[in-house]
């Protein structure tokens, strides 16, 4: 089941185990159970620290990752391959006693939860966002005996996941808890536990404080650290929006990679330098005083710095039509790689005729029954090679000059209405899902009246990546820079860093 390269990598990782692990498997006579049994046997044969026993669990096929004689609360329902294979390997190592790579303050927060909390997360194995949530909840289960977590592959347990239209979908004690990517800190916050502000207030002022965690942020941080400046990063997550990107093929010298791999490599590169990286928390305000630039965090802590580089990136742009907000995660989705498998053999729409929209339609056409692509303009804007591929697919319709006007449905999406711009007629297409791919909106809501923004809400910068406020710079997709590309953002981050350094030595 595992190829030779994966086995070799796994063998090296299993050598890091610090104790014994027991797979407790619930297996039947079905094909999926046989596949799971084969996977578990392959893994167990690679380490003397791993044993397998069989026992009836809540779901079949499934298995728990326990210590001998001790339940950890970690269960995988289905076969954790694809993006979830890393979640399994990490669970094995942590259950064996390998210390988690998490700040002690976060570990203390997890230990302080009283519980009991029983989490279940529905995933798809092609989902880029799901492993973050699965790994966060598995970690919490390892640390706190009052927490349990089960990963559920929606493709295996279709009856349970029938009404799940966006993953990851997290349930706590049977009630919906959250959707989409969540960090450990996000989960702790939703449970009412917040990071102690004193942990941040006691920090010495920085030379450069970078707000955001994407490519521009990483580039800026490395450049300023190499200049010997005291550098800090405050971000929700390292990698930013890139984490949600499936394939990257235009980052020069790297022929092909994924968003998650890119983000992991970025985090490793940042860690090689003396950079104070604060993740799982967001900035809520910024102001320049006579003595410093002050950045307020969501826990009301305040950080001070001589200069600040804003690189908070952008988020998916919404249609802003009736029914959309109400039916997000109920058929309205933004990530075809994550949520596409949930619409197998169903009819869906893709909104947007740029590269992202056409790529999404091509990918979805291989999964769903039928795709209708809507584009507001009179022609598609995607690269010609993508358009040719799209038009060759038999289960795709293209509607140009189409203005979407309403998402239809009560509890779930049942259709979309649009206006034909050439005739003025309103029409309805019955379908089950809508994937919105109309670009990004800058994450600048926290910057109102702090720095100058343009009509699109982007931070306005000059050739030095400086804003209108001395000492405050900006880089990446959050700015009014025309082209939004990873490689351009990294160059912008470096430019902002070098000009922040120049500002410091001149002031």
From Swiss-Prot:
Keywords recorded for this protein, A-Z: Disulfide bond, FAD, Flavoprotein, NAD, NADP, Oxidoreductase, Redox-active center
EC main group: oxidoreductase
Function description: Serves to protect the cell against DNA damage by alkyl hydroperoxides. It can use either NADH or NADPH as electron donor for direct reduction of redox dyes or of alkyl hydroperoxides when combined with the AhpC protein.
Cofactor: FAD
Binding residues annotated for FAD, in chain numbering: 207-222, 467-477
Protein name: Alkyl hydroperoxide reductase subunit F
Entry's family note: Belongs to the class-II pyridine nucleotide-disulfide oxidoreductase family.
Pfam (any one): Thioredoxin_3
Cofactor descriptive note: Binds 1 FAD per subunit.
